[in-house]
Amino acid sequence: MVEEEAKGLPVSKRVWKQEKEPLRANSRVVKNKKLTSWELKKQKRLEEQQYKERLKALKDEKLETKRQQIEAMKLRREKKEEKERYERLAAKMHAKKVERLRRREKRNKALKER
């Protein structure tokens, strides 16, 4: 402490000016610095926010897959119903066609017997 006081006057002779120390970047970094309570709260809040965002993303992804599955099931059901409808329609049409042919044959047979 005594040595610091014995430096003497600055070269510029301006004693009211503060003496500046050289900038050393390494000296500014404090390793293993203990965080203040505010910094701890801030860090904890940030971690909680990131955790919630990840949870939300996972839930959204899960809901999206569920929605896609439901959509696929609906499409499958619609296709199945459409196919069944066409089969019923085809059977009905086939029966109508057979009936028409039978009537024609009866007509032809009746004409031949005359």
Curated annotation (Swiss-Prot):
<protein>
    <recommendedName>
        <fullName>rRNA-processing protein CGR1</fullName>
    </recommendedName>
</protein>
<keyword id="KW-0175">Coiled coil</keyword>
<comment type="function">
    <text>Involved in nucleolar integrity and required for processing of the pre-rRNA for the 60S ribosome subunit.</text>
</comment>
<dbReference type="GO" id="GO:0006364">
    <property type="term" value="P:rRNA processing"/>
</dbReference>
<keyword id="KW-0690">Ribosome biogenesis</keyword>
<dbReference type="InterPro" id="IPR005579">
    <property type="entry name" value="Cgr1-like"/>
</dbReference>
<comment type="similarity">
    <text>Belongs to the CGR1 family.</text>
</comment>
<keyword id="KW-0698">rRNA processing</keyword>
<keyword id="KW-0539">Nucleus</keyword>
<dbReference type="Pfam" id="PF03879">
    <property type="entry name" value="Cgr1"/>
</dbReference>
<feature type="coiled-coil region">
    <location>
        <begin position="39"/>
        <end position="100"/>
    </location>
</feature>
<dbReference type="GO" id="GO:0005730">
    <property type="term" value="C:nucleolus"/>
</dbReference>
